[in-house]
Amino acid sequence: MQYDVIIIGAGIVGLTLAIGLAKQSLKVVLVDAGKQPKQPKPIKGDKAPVFNARVSAISSASEALLKDLDVWDKIARMQPYTHMHVWDTDGFGEIAFDTHSVPTMGTPKLALGHIIENEVINAALFEQLTHYANADCYFNAKASDLHTNESGASLLIEPNKAEAFHASAKLLVGADGANSKVRSSFGFTHTFWDYDHHGIVANVSTQYAHGNTARQAFTPFGPLAFLPLSDPHQSSIVFSQQSNQAAKLMDLNDAEFEKALQVAINNHYGSVTLNTPRVDFPLRMRYANKWTCKHVAIIGDAAHTIHPLAGQGANLGISDVLTLLDIVAKHKDSLGEVGMLRKYERCRKAEAMKVIATMEGFKRLFDGEQAFKKLIRNVGLLGANKLPGVKAFFIAQAMG
């Protein structure tokens, strides 16, 4: 089967790219080993919704692209956050800002961003993609025998309970995550380091309403974020902790863990109750040294993974999509050729490295209990809250 573009990986980044390319009238096939996304079930009566623990903080730039692709209005539920509060639990530094702090060009900002479950975004994206007759999707499918020649890229697609077939295209895009098969198949080496931290995620109910506020507390062992969900008394938590401390937290029973959250967040929410099981995962940085070769490109987490400190992983991937869509639109006659792909690589590699360096600097500053580090970060937060230029930098990071 002949296509213009083959995409492996149907997460937020892969689905967004597929819609954008289909909108440009290109013939696209999307292949993923996972299940087909489904919209969440409607809430019946007064029953509180059950949220998935994996969420993204979607920036205004990402929102703009999703609106342009007619996806935004299909997202079943989301929570705008209008305030952000960051502080050091063991010091005096803090920074707080809201939509009124954001410089605008005449149009007031209604939100700093939106907290949305990843599976809800994926469901909306897939629903929109099904409107395009020039886009094929295969879920529960295996992709193998990836290779290129002078005319394009090809692979074997093995759908679940269907006959395998070969597909070829001028461009193959790997949107297949941190352990990318596309990246490894074409020998794209990557820089890697382990943060020696684990992220613990869960959804919680709280005694006090979140007030549309995202809060992040820097504890002695790592940051804790409470991200507001569309139920006023529910939040998604991300607790990034040194690996040994994370293991201790995972060993606590639910009541003990809930109390630990309440203390770590300075009792801003009153009592805290777990709604979902805790899930932990190692935090690692990856940065591909090469992103493209003739007829092949990688994108999103396949090209870069960053510390979740500022929740910018999804936005960084969507920015990759925006750049690639723009370059494809201008170079359809040379789709998949080295020149056009290098333009994408040069632009996005530089931006990704800048974000990685910024997040790494924050991570190192807020990790550890040395007296000098504590003084610098507390003075830094205090100064950021007082100085407009520095505060604007923090706001820009929060808004992606």
Residue map of PLM features:
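N-terminal Rossmann-like FAD-binding beta1-loop-alpha1 element of flavoenzymes
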Residues: 3-30
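Conserved Rossmann-like nucleotide-cofactor binding loop
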Residues: 13, 36, 179
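Glycine-rich FAD pyrophosphate-binding loop
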Residues: 22-54
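N-terminal FAD cofactor-binding segment of flavoenzymes
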Residues: 48-89
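Conserved FAD-binding catalytic core of PHBH/FMO-like flavoproteins
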Residues: 66, 160-166, 171-278, 288
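Conserved N-terminal helical subregion
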Residues: 68, 77-185, 193-198
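FAD/FMN-dependent oxidoreductases across multiple families
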Residues: 245-338
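C-terminal helical "tail/cap" subdomain of flavin- and related membrane-associated enzymes
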Residues: 326-400
